[in-house]
């Protein structure tokens, strides 16, 4: 739902105030719409973690909230993103791994981030030893 607020000053009568207010609100609702970003599936592909206790980390997006755009311009919105193919451990939750931008007629309307959804610790000696022992026991 889109909310619009109109402030009218200096109206000559209550009838004029309501008439002008209705025109202003009709104009706003008739001229604009809410655009909710459609994030491509490729953005959510996991990223490989080098030297981590986990092989990969899931990703999420931040700052990709809906925005108001001129009505009918939805098909002209373009999405561009860049993200790391792999990253070295440690990785903290919320760590920036890329950017995602939405543009309308060349003007940036949304500038978001691609971030790690989980933390991945750097592999240590104890973890590596435990992993080796577990693999030996599974033979």
Feature roles, as predicted:
Residues 1-139:
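Domain-terminus/edge residues, biased toward the C-terminal soluble/receptor-binding domains
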